[in-house]
Amino acid sequence: MKSLVPLVVFAVHLASCSLDPLAKALGLNSPFLDDRAEQTHDYVQWLFPLDEPSGSVQGAPVLSDLDIDEIKKSPAAQAYLIKASEWFFQFLNRNQRWVAKYDHKQLRITRAIRSLRLLVGDIEADNFRQSIFDYLGEDVDLIGEKAKSFWKGA
């Protein structure tokens, strides 16, 4: 697998910024962030990298074992990932079209949970997943069983 040590440097830089990580990465102010995120289909692969290729975005980052170790050891990278998960959760709250039987954002939620588990830990991943279920409340039945199963297994 290719190494993404530059991604670690990128994450450390973003963690030190006061703006949302995606807004800073795209050079945007927060009011324009949601529209830009909707148009940028690979943003979640950069916000929440994994150690395996993306099934939907060719050329998306793939973390090596070295990258994973460096991210786990970096307080700034950890802070970046937590900040990214907070932004993503708020993005989902503001853009509720994903609350349906199927929506591509449900795959992004799975990726976020998996990335948090891989790079930050079980507690942060479980908290993010639980925040999604808490947000859905009674509307959880609108989400397809397959998506809910992926979230629980991520």
Question: What does each of the following model-derived ranges do?
Answer:
Residues 4-96, 113-116, 123-126, 131, ...:
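N-terminal leader regions that mediate targeting or early regulatory function
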